[in-house]
Regions:
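Structured-RNA-binding interfaces characteristic of tRNA pseudouridine synthases
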Residues: 2-227
Length: 227
């Protein structure tokens, strides 16, 4: 059976979901929602592979995923026609907090996770005495004074290839905890402090733990070199 390979770009608001990865105990996952729609539409189990497994409550602007459709699902349609059909299916059936922004035919060998070059995560803090009403779902409110330059100094110690086991939320992690961080950008934008991390991959809860550590430095809990 010939299986055409399709690549899609997904954006989602992760507020009410238990993360990306499908779970047996809940249907509130991003992967589970998309797979359910595809499987129902084509009358067979269709599994998708994501480039990364975002944690519960994490949002995505450009999650990459791929899946395969057997010829039997195509009903004589061209790849371009099938891509358009898939776009319409997602628009019609996905909830309003998940959107597939792009669908196209990928090469036979393309795999969204195995072909990752780098990933970028952003963590946002609203650093003011008052909360941000309209962005409250997307920013942590912390009103403590923070030294951005001290956090930047600490971030330099985290760059490069390291064993980040101490920054992993899963103590039972059996796979390698070695990762490479290419860049950490920390900047103040008005009342917001924005942390942008780029690397070859990140562990479970790693972004949250990294940010918490840098914030401790920014608040003077310990000096940058302690990182």
């Amino acid at each position: 059976i010939f299986m055409a390979n399709y690549k899609m770009i997904i954006q989602y608001d992760g507020t009410r979901y238990k993360g990306w990865q499908r779970q047996k105990t809940t249907d509130q996952t991003i992967q589970g929602k998309i797979e359910a729609i595809l499987s129902r539409q084509y009358g067979r189990t269709i599994e998708i592979d994501g480039s990364g497994r975002t944690d519960a409550g994490v949002h995505a602007h450009g999650q990459v995923a791929n899946f395969r459709l057997p010829d039997a699902c195509c009903a004589g349609k061209t790849p371009e026609e099938l891509c358009e059909e898939l776009r319409q299916i997602f628009v019609q059936y996905l909830p309003e907090d998940i959107a597939v922004t792009e669908v196209r035919v990928a090469s036979e060998r393309f795999h969204s996770r195995l072909n990752v070059v780098k990933k970028t995560y952003v963590y946002r803090i609203w650093n003011a005495d008052y909360p941000n009403v309209f962005e409250r779902k997307y920013m942590l409110h912390d009103n403590r004074p923070m030294d951005v330059e001290a956090m930047r100094q600490a971030a330099r110690y985290l760059l490069g290839k390291h064993d980040f086991a101490a920054f992993c939320g899963n103590a039972k992690m059996k796979k390698s905890t070695v990762r490479t961080i290419h860049e950490i950008d920390i900047r103040r934008i008005g009342e917001e402090i924005r942390f942008t991390y780029t690397g070859n991959g990140f562990l479970q809860n790693m972004i949250r733990i990294l940010t918490g550590t840098l914030v401790d430095v920014g608040c003077g809990v310990y000096p940058p070199e302690r990182v």
